């Protein structure tokens, strides 16, 4: 007998199953996708012991003709494609013809299927046909998989914990449900219903069923298109985040896919609105010509290759960015304070309007998609548990201690000063702190102009050409309210009011945002302004780092950092940009060089962004710094002029909002509707 021989069909199927059927979730995925491809409108998934004991999928789809049932269990047998051209225009979820034979080769499979005219029951175990018989059934398919991996114990041994395997099944079903909102899905584990969608074609209803009504209310619809691509979906407001990227779902032509570039594009669309290490909930549905996407990359069909991927990524990021510009991003304090109880939803509860993305998230001059308008009919009818807030707020007008009074003084650029740039607010140390009348604040600002960054000085008001001209940075009162200062709490938070309630602001985050927008613009400008050093800075690095640094010298020079070789592995710096914080010049330069050493693909834009964030944080006031009334009011007056006054550059919220009704509820001046009925 020769050394080379053909493998048996059963062994070949078991080998193929190693790629197609990795875990119980893989079985669920393949069977549910088959049901969707068969035009099912209702799919029930019944799982026992995380799928290891049994998996049953019932659908009302087309069914399989009795003459083709055996063919369906042969390798590479499919109804999805017939020619080579079809492979480049795949519209179905499955097309490789590997799922059923792969599953049948490593498990016990019983399938009952009917086209409505005739029905068939078939039984496979370990790839061998045990029984086939007629079975009168309604139209659809009912397939049960038991004893998974009974003949491949190594695969069974390396399964994760039951909780992890169940979580994988949930993730698979969730993503398919998000891909096909017109199909009603029901997932039951050990007789407990874990997921139920209504199948009414409304994506936001499905999001509510998966992530909860409270979270769905904090998501906004997005739409965008180019010549080649069409985009729709929902993205969470920046306050609704998770610790991992797995809550970002990208769908291409109805298929949930994994693509690192598109996931990054979603995150990029939020910019600095997200906290560091936090990621949004997002469902991005993309439609394109099948010729632009190759799904025949891996048997699981989750990894795809995209034509024009940079253009698609740009569409995703810009659509999200533009949408969030129109949304009031001030979070409700009560919504984020209490602990929310998980809601168990029935189908009736899912038929609610979530487009009221809550009155606290008002959208300016945007039309609502038709699907969301249908949703907008009954959010008030949803059964909600009121957030309980036991937080007590104590406001006092106590003056700062003598030590703290001597510690701070604000220098705030005048809106009518000669430079119309968005200057950062500087808090500097002084021996004495004397109160300044509001009317004399501009004069005080001029007298302290030496503390201005970038070596600038303010022109006298009477000679300023900008003094009589209307400011170009009028506060956007529709997006951010004009606040009236009330007081300071613990030297960290500012209390303010507006017509719609009370606001609490993090003074560090607020000033950091103001500074960031100034530095982002200033660092991006080519400026010859340099501050000479009395004592040059000497920087020593190992040889491997020196080679990398020399490659990046042009990039450093664009930001005004000029390194000169100083023999061996050393560099010397004679001057630095004027926007460096005094006393931290060497630390700042070293930190910037470290960025380049850690990421050799860092672009100029990314480098400037990181520099702006670093400088804005270094020059912002910290917690436990008491401000006088003029300083606090100046901070509140400057904040609305920011492009994004809602978050600091690291994504932390600048302010939270207690509405008038929130305050009345906390003090029991009004009752929630469900309390009134009790």
Curated annotation (Swiss-Prot):
Pfam families: DNA_mis_repair, HATPase_c_3, MutL_C
A GO MF term: ATP hydrolysis activity
Domain of life: Bacteria
GO CC field: mismatch repair complex
Alphabetical list of InterPro entries matching this protein: DNA_mismatch_repair_CS, DNA_mismatch_repair_MutL, DNA_mismatch_S5_2-like, HATPase_C_sf, MutL/Mlh/PMS, MutL/Mlh/Pms-like, MutL_C, MutL_C_dimsub
UniProt-listed GO biological process terms: mismatch repair
Entry keyword set: DNA damage, DNA repair
Protein family membership: Belongs to the DNA mismatch repair MutL/HexB family.
Function: This protein is involved in the repair of mismatches in DNA. It is required for dam-dependent methyl-directed DNA mismatch repair. May act as a 'molecular matchmaker', a protein that promotes the formation of a stable complex between two or more DNA-binding proteins in an ATP-dependent manner without itself being part of a final effector complex.
HAMAP family, A to Z: DNA_mis_repair
Protein name: DNA mismatch repair protein MutL
Native species: Lactiplantibacillus plantarum (strain ATCC BAA-793 / NCIMB 8826 / WCFS1)
